[in-house]
Amino acid sequence: MTRVLHVLDHSLPLHSGYTFRTRAILKAQQTCGIEVRGLTGLRHLADGPDMEEAEGILFHRTRGPASGPAGLREWREIARLAESIEKLCEQWRPDVLHAHSPALCGAAALRAARKLGIPLVYEIRAFWEDAAVGNGTGRENSLKYRLTRRLEDHVVAGADAVVTICQGLKDDLVSRGVDAERINISPNGVDLALFGAPVAADPALRKALDLGTGPVIGFIGSFYDYEGIDDLIAAMPLLSQVIPVPACCWLAAGRVRRHYRRRRRSLA
């Protein structure tokens, strides 16, 4: 049976879009007869044992601090995760390493893959330096921004295969000189079976939220610039021309929440 070790920033039982995508990938691989495990780095901060099962998937943890000034701290973090990967590979003998964003995970997996002679798949879910700019924790073209991008490029160049979650990320890599033939796209998706039978509409809830009687477009996520909510707001007047009385309901929080409220009022 083929074995794949997934190298992760964090995982179940924590809940996030990151962990839900990971769960879907690992479950799909299990369905295909592939044996999978996950290994998280130092940024998985939840309490728990060093080896933990969640939803039928076994996860291993990397322990210990990575101290020091910025830059050196991340380098030590990569080294510690690489050591964990090598140790687990000696015990479990995976056929493939599958590293997921951020580049810190990719760099650690690349180091271990080269040492052990194991093929590496690197999956990019976002460019984290751009995400930091979008959520206000980073600045474009800063030293940290440029170093993060250089590290990403290093991992992409060394990986045996590269996966992105969308065409935009692939196009960005191609613009940096990466061969398009090396990049596959694996978009996000939803397993409708997990939702069960559709729940009947609740008239009282519709009235309380002032959703009217027409179709409702819902968004559950985070209010950040890169989520594209501005496009959704701009599309609502166009949708109203083809759909009778559409409504839009958001369930989220984030730094640009007030901006979206102003945009909504401007279209009212």
What does each model-identified segment do?
Residues 196-211:
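A short helix/loop element that forms part of the nucleotide-sugar donor recognition site in Leloir-type
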Residues 77-83, 119-121, 129-154:
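Nucleotide-sugar donor phosphate/pyrophosphate-binding loop at the beta->alpha transition
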Residues 1-64, 239:
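N-terminal subdomain of nucleotide-sugar transferases
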Residues 42, 168, 189:
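Carbohydrate-associated surface elements
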Residues 252, 258-268:
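Nucleotide-activated donor-binding/catalytic signature segment of Leloir-type glycosyltransferases, i.e.
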Residues 66-96, 107, 115, 146-150:
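An amphipathic, basic-hydrophobic alpha-helix
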Residues 3-7, 211-236, 249:
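Conserved donor-binding/catalytic core segment of Leloir-type glycosyltransferases
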